Amino acid sequence: MRHANLALDLHIAEKRYGARTVLRDVGIGLRQGEVVSLIGASGCGKSSFLSIASGLDRDFRGEIKLHGQPLDGVHRDIGFIFQEPRLFPWLTVAQNVAFDSDNDAAAQKLSTRLLTEVGLQEQAQSLPKQLSGGQAQRAAIARGLFSHPRVLLLDEPFSAVDAFTRMKLQDLLLKVARQRELTVLLVTHDIDEALYLSDRIILLDGVGSPAVTEFRPPPRPRGRGDVALAALKSSIIDRLHAVHAI
């Protein structure tokens, strides 16, 4: 998919770590407002791809375009949420959210609004050690939204929380993405999560041919466990076995 109006357009000709090639001829384009999940076996290059997409990793051959313009490094239009919340333990939740700012009145107001949006207004003055795992990840989501990004990258953000909290965070992500028309690229090992959240699912085989295989869940609205998703899940698992011999 190569269109001029893509929010994020990536072509990675090659990414190497020493003598080992982890990505070769991988091309993925994301439309504005689209939620895309990136799946694949461990070691297939998902995290490397996400690091390149964020602008953090420039040591590769290829090209990234953000809203049609070359991306040459970290950009405030791209937010990043990690598997672990990575909150500064000596700062309050509100200060963590507004960390990358002058912490002036406008920043504090925005921090308060974002914490309200993710349901943490009562914990604004708490320290990270006082939060549950789910609350800490909510704070990380608020921090990821602080710069008003148009693209949000997430690296297995819900894998460290319990199943009930995971579902609530998934619904929060969908709500925020719709309200802000965010483009979302989510790395996950959870096929059910990908099926529930995504407009498209991309199975990555970093050095394979083809390097990507695309799946499209049925249109929304759809719920967890919908019968229509079962056949697609089976197809994805079959393809995973074929690609990665797992």
Can you say where each PLM-predicted feature lies in the sequence?
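Extended, non-globular alpha-helical segments
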Residues: 160-163, 231-246
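ABC family nucleotide-binding domain
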Residues: 3-181, 185-192, 197, 203
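Active-site/binding-pocket entry motifs
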Residues: 87, 220-221, 242
